[in-house]
Design a protein with these regions (language model features):
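Cysteine-nucleophile amide-bond enzymes
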Residues: 1-293
Length: 293
């Protein structure tokens, strides 16, 4: 673990079933996470290739997915090992090479001490939460590969959230907060530390301001970690899938009801318009009067 303080890089020969691995993307701006299940295969959660954050802007292509579809896109032939497993999005399984997409391999650490956690200034590399056994982790990952992990969300339900859930079985209950992702928690803590208005009243020197800002950043990261959050609860994977399916069914029913209501409203509007047109026609062209008598 001491070596992991400087780098979480690991050789693929040292991987074990159930390991949470990741690889940095776009010059270390963000990382893509997954669960290693053995035989150089990885299960991970992704949005459609080229739509990682779904903003409809150039950022979608900048933050690319690590799905087999992304790796086999363009003129290059599909991967001989996992090309037949291609899915457009959701929970996917791919070989380790496609997952890494040319990047280096890193191991996410669990059950670290508070001192180690704070020493790793970059979020999304470790957590204070303890990991379950490798078999339990692999079971969750395979179950979600078959059943799905819900809708992808950069802030609530991303690839790191998926991997952390598989490792710990922990979910965040609070609706108005970021998910389990250490990357997003780190970013949120940084913005909060810089934007906190009391900073200018706590110190008058540049050095003091840096110390206060660093302190607030560390506190923000620590209280957001899944290992210390009070709103984190253990949820069996079968229960999670059942809840997700029920929510999706309810949303589909709501959308269908809204669509039906809109169709009925449009039909009534069309009928009213037809009646109004007919009334106008009678006004403009009154029936002819018989003057023969």
């Amino acid at each position: 673990m001491a070596a992991g303080l400087l780098s979480n890089r690991v050789d693929r020969e040292d991987l074990a079933v159930g390991d949470h691995i990741y690889s940095w993307r776009a010059a270390y701006i963000y990382a893509h996470h997954g669960i290693y299940i053995g035989d150089e295969m990885v299960i991970h959660f992704t949005r459609a290739a080229g739509h990682e954050i779904g903003t409809g802007t150039f950022l979608d292509s900048f933050l690319f997915s690590s799905s087999p579809a992304a790796s086999s896109a363009g003129d290059s032939p599909p991967c001989q090992r996992c090309g037949h497993l291609v899915r457009p999005d959701g929970v996917v399984m791919s070989c380790l090479d496609c997952f890494l997409h040319g990047g280096s391999l890193y191991l996410f650490h669990y059950g670290v001490s508070p001192a180690f956690f704070l020493a790793k200034a970059r979020g999304g590399t470790c957590t204070l939460a303890a990991s379950d056994t490798g078999d339990a982790v692999a079971h969750r990952a395979r179950y979600l590969l078959d059943k799905g992990f819900g809708a992808y969300s950069l802030f609530k339900n991303n690839c790191e959230d998926f991997a952390i859930y598989c490792k710990t079985g922990l979910l965040v209950e609070t609706a108005f907060s970021v998910g389990r992702s250490g990357q997003l928690a780190s970013l949120t803590a940084a913005f909060s530390a810089v934007a906190s208005s009391p900073l200018r009243f706590l110190t008058t020197s540049a050095g003091g301001l840096a110390v206060v800002t660093t302190g607030l950043y560390c506190v923000g990261r620590y209280v957001s970690d899944i290992g210390v959050r009070r709103d984190a609860v253990k949820v069996p994977v079968e229960t999670l899938v059942a809840q997700t399916s029920a929510t999706a069914t309810a949303m589909e029913a709501e959308v269908a009801a809204e669509t039906s209501a809109s169709a009925m409203e449009a039909e009534v509007t069309a009928e009213n318009s037809a009646v109004a047109v007919a009334a106008d026609a009678d006004t403009v062209c009154p029936p002819a009067v018989d003057r023969g008598s």
